[in-house]
Design a protein with these regions (language model features):
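A detector for short, charged/polar N-terminal pre-domain segments
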Residues: 1-5, 72
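Short basic helix-loop element that most often maps to the first helix and adjoining turn
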Residues: 5-24, 50
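Conserved hydrophobic/aromatic packing and binding residues within compact polymer-binding modules
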Residues: 7, 21-22, 32-35, 62
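DNA major-groove recognition helix of helix-turn-helix/homeodomain DNA-binding modules
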Residues: 26, 46-61
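Recognition helix of helix-turn-helix/homeodomain-like DNA-binding domains
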Residues: 26-42
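DNA major-groove recognition helix of helix-turn-helix
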Residues: 36, 47, 66
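Short, charged recognition helix plus adjacent turn
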Residues: 64-84
């Protein structure tokens, strides 16, 4: 499974639309569509980290370096409360 397929799979598991994922990471739904279809140029750097965070998987999983989508560690509650 390639990067785009993994993004698509995890987005569907989270019951998110392309628009919702795009809004969560600050890109258009067209960008998410292109990423899922294999145009990885749009997914470099900060977008990969943001997608992993929103989808609650490691960047290594999205990049195909790990086979299992291990969830990320939750942020400490006090840090989340300070940011909100």
């Amino acid at each position: 499974m390639n990067f785009g397929e993994r993004v698509h799979l995890m987005r569907r598991r989270k019951k998110m639309t392309q628009k919702e994922l795009g809004e969560a990471i600050g890109v258009s739904k067209t960008t998410i569509f292109r990423i899922e279809k294999g145009d990885f140029a749009d997914a470099m750097g900060q977008h990969i980290a943001k997608m992993a965070r929103v989808l609650n998987v490691s960047a290594d999983y999205l990049l195909g370096l790990k086979e299992e989508p291990a969830p990320l560690e939750p942020e400490p509650r006090e840090q989340v409360e300070q940011e909100g």
